[in-house]
Amino acid sequence: MAVIDQHQDDFSNVSWNTDEHTAAESSSSVTATEFDDTERNGHNAYESDAPGSDGQEVLDCVVSEPLKENDGSKDTFVSYLITTNTTFPSFQRSQTTVRRRFTDFVFLYKALSRDYPTAAVPPLPDKQRMEYVSGNRFGPDFTNRRAHSLQRFLNRLSLHPVLRRADILHIFLESPDWNATMRSRSVRGSTSSDTGSSGVFDNLTDSFLNAFTKAHKHDKRFLEVRERSDKLDEDLAHIEKVVARVARRENDIELDFKDLAEQFQKLITLEPGVENEVRHFANSIEDTAMGLRKLKDVTDGDYLGSLRDMQAYSTALKSLLKAREQKQVDYEQLTEYLNKNTVDRDQLQSGQGSSGLSGASGRLMRKLEDVRGVDHEQARRDRQRKLEMNIDKLTTEAERAKKTSEMFDDEVVKEVADFERIKRVEFKKQLGGLADSQIEFYDEVTEIWEGYVKAMEKEGVSGTRSTGVEPPGRRLAD
């Protein structure tokens, strides 16, 4: 059943971070009403979302420069440069730079998930979700996409009021001897796993049984969160398809422009009389193709990846909601079992046979006791004493489960508010970056072709075939 030993409960030793969470982030509300008010603030809420805007410590991380290391050996891997600017007093310097590989990020994620079970820890990019990338896992397409995803992972951690203060995160961002930290924590983790191994089977049994049990009373707040998360996933999936189609078309147009420029270059040998005009025209087309390449890299490599990463983050929130529901199911199952034992005890006290059972089952039990020569009164007292012991134990367990469930509810409400705030900041940043790339592309294309027109007009005014007026193309190549 759902009777859970105190030492086997994964959340029995959890620090619920009530004071720390509230002090760390005032925008994290504890009620759905306050959270809705935060959402309705609209654009004004963005100002308070920025790190350090409310006077708290700044933690700004930048992931860049993927580097292939140990090339040519079986231990080849890619490391990423992490540059951190912070005002946290726990850091030795305000700016630090370290290199970390993907397995280091995995270790950090697992450590945070273990240390903060009541938090929706942002997920890492899944290795199996990179099949759409051309080339191998050491190619620039793959490593640049992963760098963008790792950047979003650290951004989410830096915006979370509790996770941003985690010691393991600070060590990850600064320590020059990270491998030693991983080894020491792995040893401690394996030791604690051995200590608690006796309860593994019981926990698995409880989880398996409760997996088929649903909560009887549903909290409207979390039902609404689940519905909104499902709607978010649906919308993101639609947007992802459209953006992927846009990226493919940008790539096709880029290839068409390159082919067009190549064909005009071939035309020069056939029409030497317009060599200068054709060369400038071909160069302008080629520069436009380079601009499309940059635009496609932002659309496909960064923005499209952000949509997939947000879907994964939404899934992490749903997992937390499921864990919250599991805590509620545990409490309801314990309460149901307690009520059953209470009814059995009351039936015994009312004198409904030594078994405490009524109906056909009670009569059958009494006949069996008669055949065995059991003293009915002694059997009744023994069963009543056993039921009293069970009731006392179940009462304690039910009260503890209720407290755990209520605390978990409060933490999940805070996590939902944090998720919405982080999502809002990320959407604003990603959409802003996409808009900036579009503006930059069209500004540069306008400059390229205006330069070409001016160059051609100047040639027409001079009446000679100038060879020195180069339109401001080629700038995109730089």
From Swiss-Prot:
GO cellular component terms, A-Z: cytosol; early endosome; endosome membrane; lipid droplet; mitochondrial membrane; mitochondrion; phagophore assembly site membrane
Cited Pfam families: PX
Q: Which InterPro entries does UniProt cross-reference here?
A: AH/BAR_dom_sf, PX_dom, PX_dom_sf
Q: How does it sit in the membrane?
A: Peripheral membrane protein
Source organism, top-level taxon: Eukaryota
The annotated phenotype of a deletion mutant is: Abrogates mitophagy. Decreases formation of secondary hyphae. Decreases colony growth and reduces conidial production. Decreases virulence on A.thaliana.
Keyword list (alphabetical) reads: Autophagy, Cytoplasm, Endosome, Lipid droplet, Lipid-binding, Membrane, Mitochondrion, Transport
Q: Say what the protein does.
A: Sorting nexin, involved in the separation or division of vacuoles throughout the entire life cycle of the cells. Involved in retrieval of late-Golgi SNAREs from post-Golgi endosomes to the trans-Golgi network, for cytoplasm to vacuole transport (Cvt), and autophagy of large cargos including mitophagy, pexophagy and glycophagy. Required for the switch to necrotrophic growth.
> What family does the database annotate?
Belongs to the sorting nexin family.
Q: What does the subunit comment say?
A: Interacts with the mitochondrial prohibitin complex subunits PHB1 and PHB2; the interaction is direct and plays a role in mitophagy.
Q: What is this protein called?
A: Sorting nexin-4
The organism named in the record is Colletotrichum higginsianum (strain IMI 349063) (Crucifer anthracnose fungus)
